[in-house]
Amino acid sequence: EEARDLAERLITNMAEKTAEAHGMTAEVKVTRGYPPTINNGGFVDLVETALTKNFGQGAFARDAHPRMGFEDFSFILQRYPGAFVFLGTAPKGVNPLEAAGNHSPYMEIDEDAMANGAAAHAAVAFEFLNHGMGGGVDGAD
């Protein structure tokens, strides 16, 4: 939220000062939509542990690049520790990095992957209920 506040202040200031320099006024209205989706680091570690234990090395990969997406789940992550995780569903023989995205009309999925998704959720829940998050977050253990 600090970054959003700063961006709003800077944009407002720039608009007002630019307008003032030209003998005008400016009014900036910002409508805030969804908050950013920010995973809890401790919960990401828990997910990695659960998926590696249950599906083996290579079943979990951290995305090194932040994404600008937003999601209803963001509201939950503001209140509770958690992690937004992508499930690989590209059809066999298709490079996941080249597959059409979730909101594309060209998206195809390997429906067998859905069972893995359900099993992954169960594995994460089992790991959390049996081991918690190692004391990293209030209310998470």
What are these regions (language model features)?
Residues 1-141:
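Metal-dependent amide/peptide-bond hydrolase catalytic core
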